[in-house]
């Protein structure tokens, strides 16, 4: 029998469960698939199937992540769940699982805990735009006032990190009871999914964003000009479009694309995901290089100084064996190239240990096309020692 074709009829949204260890993230993930499976909108996945998450590598870092998919009436969802706290930190910072929104799971019996706060902070820093709250284990709390108190605490915590704490939907339920098939608690899972459907907007598709392509290679074709090759990261490029060559030099250079080819065939246009060669008018071989980007004029600018949220690899992950201090000068790998940068640690932080997750300020020795949310690796002598996400542009 032919394999079922993935019908792209519904808009696609990436979400994930976040929250403190043992508050029920994986149980909730199992409950969502189980309840939706009864409506024929998912394949039921048991707790053990999700918990035994396979390891993946992203930017040289090993991360365990479970992926499940399911549908509601309106959408198709890809949902990520991580077994360990460190996996969440790594996942969010490397962008291995880009989230359009997250379900924050908080145990009603315990209230917000340290990792609850840390995951909210991470969501803010790496640009997870929307959070919906699932207050779990409500079957274990008899006192209605206590539930309201926990809800208020969670809302305050979200507001503290610039999420709209007053507007965020909070669903009170029990993932375990829903998983066991109790109809009253199953209804709460449906209520949660309705809230996710309504509150988390459909993300703008990559192809609808302004054009940008990191340059991987450059060569000249005699009699035709200079070709820059790479994979289109977002947007659409048409023959005749004006683009800017950005990064590694003070001023962007403007040019016109006179040809687009893919697999040696000429195209009228290329879109996000395509590997292409772009023929650039009036650009000599030495005016464009790997590490720069081609972009729609005025949409992205080169910067040298920014704040970033960074995860530092442990020795076991192949990272450093020793801590580092302010003025540490590793290489920052953006998209296709390494640039040296100088690190300044936050006030009161003397050093960073392998395994830490920290915000730092970075100053690059050459400008690179970056924006909030741009991901990078930190490398030293060719090996990855950290991963980061730009949280704020300084200059």
From Swiss-Prot:
Residues that, per the record, bind GTP: 19-26, 81-85, 136-139
EC numbers, comma separated: 3.6.5.3
Pfam families per the UniProt record, alphabetical: GTP_EFTU, GTP_EFTU_D2, GTP_EFTU_D3
Top-level enzyme category: hydrolase
Catalytic activity: GTP + H2O = GDP + phosphate + H(+)
PROSITE patterns: G_TR_1 (PS00301), G_TR_2 (PS51722)
Alphabetic keyword roster: Cytoplasm, Elongation factor, GTP-binding, Hydrolase, Magnesium, Metal-binding, Nucleotide-binding, Protein biosynthesis
One of the record's GO cellular component terms: cytosol
Region (G3): 81-84
Location relative to the cell: Cytoplasm
SUPFAM superfamilies, A to Z: EF-Tu/eEF-1alpha/eIF2-gamma C-terminal domain, P-loop containing nucleoside triphosphate hydrolases, Translation proteins
CDD domains: EF_Tu, EFTU_II, EFTU_III
Family: Belongs to the TRAFAC class translation factor GTPase superfamily. Classic translation factor GTPase family. EF-Tu/EF-1A subfamily.
Function field: GTP hydrolase that promotes the GTP-dependent binding of aminoacyl-tRNA to the A-site of ribosomes during protein biosynthesis.
Name of the protein this chain belongs to: Elongation factor Tu
The organism of origin for this protein: Anoxybacillus flavithermus (strain DSM 21510 / WK1)
